[in-house]
Structure formats: C-alpha cells, structure tokens
Design a protein with these regions (language model features):
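Long C-terminal interaction/binding lobes of large macromolecular proteins
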Residues: 1-239
Length: 239
C-alpha cells in the first residue's frame, strides 16, 4: 500500500515587474537539498541556477516562463518561497563600514525586504541626432551569465553582451529598428560605437532598475559607532 501524499499549502504574491498575481508553494525537502548544496558551494552561479530550478518547481500558475522573468522578479519570488518554506527571517553576518572588518550578526525579516524603484528610472533613453533606445530588463539567464563570471576580463565582455541583448529597439520620429532583427554581433558592435556619454546613459538604466533592497543599522561592538548597511540583490541576503 503506497504512503499517503500530504497536501502542500498554496500562497499568492504580486510580481513587481507587471503587477500580476501568481500562486506558489513552499519548496520540498528534495528542493531544499538542491539549495543547501548550492549555498555550501559558495559559488554564486550555482546559487542562482539552483534558485531558478526551485522556482520552476514551486510556481503553480500556468504560463509563467521563469527564464523570461526579470531578475528582480526572480529574486523577490524566491525570497517569498523561502519564507514560506524554512522561516520568515534570514540570519546574516554584515561587515561594519567604519573599520571594514568587524562582522556583526543580524536578523532580517523577509517581509521587510522590498523591491525598490528609482523615480529616475526609464526604459527609454535619448541618445543624439533624434535617436533613442528602448531597453528591456535582462532575463535570469542573462543575469547569471553577466554577474557570476570568475574571470574579470570575461566579466567585462559579458557585461557588454548583456547590455547589447537588453536592447529592445532603436528609434526616432520616423524609423524603428528592432533588436530582434539584428544579430548579437551587430548589437554589440552598435553598443561599442557609442560615445562614453551615451554609454553611461544606458548604464544608468541598469543602475536604477528595480532591485531587492533592505537598509539596517548596526553598532560596531569594537568602536561603538553606528553603521548603516544597505543590502541589495539576492546574493546579499545569503552573505
């Protein structure tokens, strides 16, 4: 006689990028094992890959393509899944900024972690000669490829590639050039042809795009000085 299946609770949350409500469940023991092994590796690429795999299993709403979600949706979704699975708080060690070495333990409640939005953030960026570029958010795959390279030179190259593949279109009052009709090589060459000032405008899109964030204050036990700590992005919450 087979063992009975125990039902799993279902929850809802709203995706920050589009306001869509989705259903999800906590992760199971087999999925927790995947995460533990990734965390023990201390390899950020393995951590993010594990997050992707677990989210695919835990998202119950049909039609949600995890690989196409913006990275900040992925991060927010994972934190909430984790909260319903193993606890509503995260234990971290943070480094005090006043001396750059003293570590202090802190507890962060998952409900206190928000996706911050910058008022100056825009996906439409004016360049020159009447041309503008419309950007799209990097997918999780692009996010992994760009952020978790161990080779500094390779990281620079992948950063350019992520910027190029995040272009949606280039346009002016009369014409529109869709990035989907261009090769990766053509897009990279176009990015490399920009002036430094134009490139900085595009970089601003990534610097101001929504991100997981939480600000806390700690006191350095050695210097007695108060420190403001800002946590940003998924990996900061597994430091």
């Amino acid at each position: 006689m087979p063992l009975p299946k125990i039902s799993t609770a279902e929850y809802e949350l709203t995706l920050p990028s589009n306001g869509k409500t989705i259903k999800y469940r906590p992760f199971l023991v087999r999925e927790e094992k995947i995460l533990i092994l990734a965390l023990e590796s201390e390899n950020q690429k393995q951590i993010t890959t594990a997050v992707r795999q677990v989210i695919k299993e835990c998202v119950l709403t049909k039609g949600i393509k995890v690989d196409q979600l913006p990275s900040f949706d992925i991060e927010y979704l994972f934190l909430n899944i984790r909260g319903k699975s193993v606890g509503e708080s995260i234990e971290l060690m943070v480094t005090c900024g006043d001396d750059g070495k003293t570590e202090v333990p802190v507890t962060v409640l998952i409900d206190d972690i928000e996706v911050s939005n910058d008022d100056e953030h825009s996906s439409d960026i004016e360049l020159s000669d009447g041309y503008s570029v419309k950007m799209k958010y990097p997918s999780l795959n692009q996010f992994i490829e760009t952020n978790f390279s161990q080779d500094d030179e390779d990281a620079v190259e992948k950063s350019f590639e992520m910027i190029a593949t995040s272009i949606d279109m280039v346009y002016n009052d009369k014409d529109m050039f869709a990035a989907s009709e261009c090769t990766k090589k053509e897009l990279k060459e176009w990015v490399e042809s920009l002036t430094s000032a134009q490139f900085q405008k595009i970089e601003q899109f990534f610097e101001t795009m929504p991100k997981l964030t939480h600000t806390l204050e700690v006191v350095n036990p050695n210097t007695k000085k108060k420190n403001t700590i800002v946590l940003e992005g998924l990996t900061d919450f597994f430091a």
